[in-house]
């Protein structure tokens, strides 16, 4: 949310913050509300407004208006960027057709996908990521390590070893269609 505010302040233009779910739209909008800046929400289950310079939206709802309204935005921030979908790619394509200078910022805690590798081509040191298979993002701009987050209280320190539990009751667990 603070990144959205910073980008809006720097550009003076509209920022679209795309989330994969209404719950994440609400969560990010609530954090942004703490800045005191106005914002809009564009999500079928929450409300639909494009009025303010920062818009929090779900991809499924925003895709219906991306062609007509996408040109208004200078930047798209993708929450959970490791889950980039064909819908998101279409939204960005529609927006870039009318605004070739559109910037896309992806945010994720998990930049590596099993089977696909990294979601970016080049790391912060300028090294090409050989494990990246058709990454959507060109470059990783900033990374925060787990130790940094633990030291500042954002994450709890992991506990390794015995949990004090002799075992778990898995009698009521059901296998899915893949038997997992």
Regions found by a protein language model. Give the residues of each.
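Conserved nucleotide-binding/hydrolysis micro-motifs of P-loop NTPases
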Residues: 22-24, 61-63, 82-83, 109-114, ...
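Inter-Walker segment of RecA-like/P-loop motor cores
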Residues: 32-68
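Short regulatory helix/loop adjacent to the ATP-binding pocket of P-loop NTPases
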Residues: 112-134
